Amino acid sequence: INYRLIRHAEAEGVTPPVKAPLHDAARALQFVRSKAREWNLDPVRIGATGGSAGACSSLWLAFHDDLADPRSADPVARESTRLFCAAVNGAQTTLDPQQMKEWTPNSRYGGHAFGVGAFPAFLTARERILPWIHEYSPYALVSADDPPVYLFYNTPPALGQDEKDPTHTSNFGVKLQEHCAAKGVRCDLVYPGAPNVKHANATAYLIATLGRQIGRAHV
């Protein structure tokens, strides 16, 4: 999808800036659902995928409560924003700087999402922006009624250690998988050397999951 970037959100005065791309993603999903009959789509069996920021957006959609407005005069806005599944690559699973620092000490990503700049300023601002973190961090939104997700990373985890690429470390995946397990949500985690790998990549997962018999709807 084509969505607004953080710089566009800042220029438009959207607060926090991350709201713009995430709500654009939700609107795109609603638009696709509104065209389900015309485009011969199953409105229930819709998954999301993406890499890095697109992965974070996909997980946000997977875990966020439905943003549909059934009373809206806009027929697109009445459509559900819930997913059947999500399969993502290199996802940032949290936007909480404290969690990032604990999982990967040399973390440096995320402050721009809330308009607070560099990572030290992000940490300092955490308490002030905590309501935003609770609304926009995928980890914070996980609940038992959420759809299954699949996470792929290019390197194995090293929790508590500095990483070469802390923005795309599989440490994010390990901690989300633990959290999902505690909530009763299926979360497949794949990285080099990962155990019990059923699907080698996100595409294989989506084909298998979206093609299976529907057990329960997520809309």
Predicted regions located by residue number:
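C-terminal catalytic histidine-bearing segment of alpha/beta-hydrolase fold enzymes
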Residues: 149-164, 170-216
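Extracytoplasmic/secreted proteins, especially bacterial periplasmic and envelope-associated proteins
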Residues: 20, 24-27, 31, 56-60, ...
